[in-house]
């Protein structure tokens, strides 16, 4: 209870806690002669190395681990839209780095023209996926930072660069570097946030528990650790021996291709099941808790997540199993009153009947309905785990408290 009400109490010490825990885990692995238990953490969904943006192509997992280079705004948009990079926090990070990459070819010397170019690029990238709020959040943060910098030139004639000795240097180039720096801050903050959510989430779980998860909210969906899989990884390093059941997550099979791959790679006891098997494993008494991520949470606690999440939540309620939704504060949208106002992305029907098969698995011309997300009503959510603490109902009151500090 103290941890829940403290809110930010441990947040200031998260980096220290993370360094200490990671050092202890490395020491334990070294003693066991196994340095690769968490090698999955080396596969960041977005990397920025030697001025190159690289994205792990998650559509090729688990068969291939391939990074692709992002050179234009179109590359970044396509990578997000086609799910080469996915997961709400990860696409926020990708959008931020992508904004910088998109501005490298800007050759002008007027800061106001540069600002307009950034605005147009940001608006374009924001259309890649409509449901997850992290894209717009990250892009707005970058734009706000740029506005503060450019405001210094508001009085400059015609928006030209200042050329006095005091302001020597190319301010447009400086602005570009500031965008890169902001992207790096967003990545580092997400890594710290995921670790904090892992610590909070682990406090709700006990060794040996059976845990069901849906879709993929692991390390390749975030900067590192994951959201709802973070406590699984921390528990693995601390000997909790969780038994995880991963829904395959139709139609794009993120649970089968990504979650089971991540967890197996990390030595976690994971069992893959079809989505329509969630009820029977609950009825069998194999599930003690459900953990899921979130792509956008409304002010009242309704949470949009991968299609099928709502059904799992309803089942958990029926069987008396706690349902925990992991939501970084960057994913909480207080401007959206309820889940009814969250836009739901609709995707092409081929993902249902053709994408994973050698031959179409449905009659030619059949109509399809393929929403990428559904909204879980707040009444089915036992608790919301954020990097600032554990939030319980009433969500319309307590979620706002996270932003009062």
Where are these regions (language model features)?
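Conserved phosphate- and dinucleotide-binding cores of soluble alpha/beta proteins
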Residues: 241, 248-405
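N-terminal active-site beta-alpha-beta segment that forms phosphate/nucleotide-binding
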Residues: 78, 84-273
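Short, hydrophobic/aliphatic alpha-helical segments
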Residues: 68-84, 203-211, 355-365
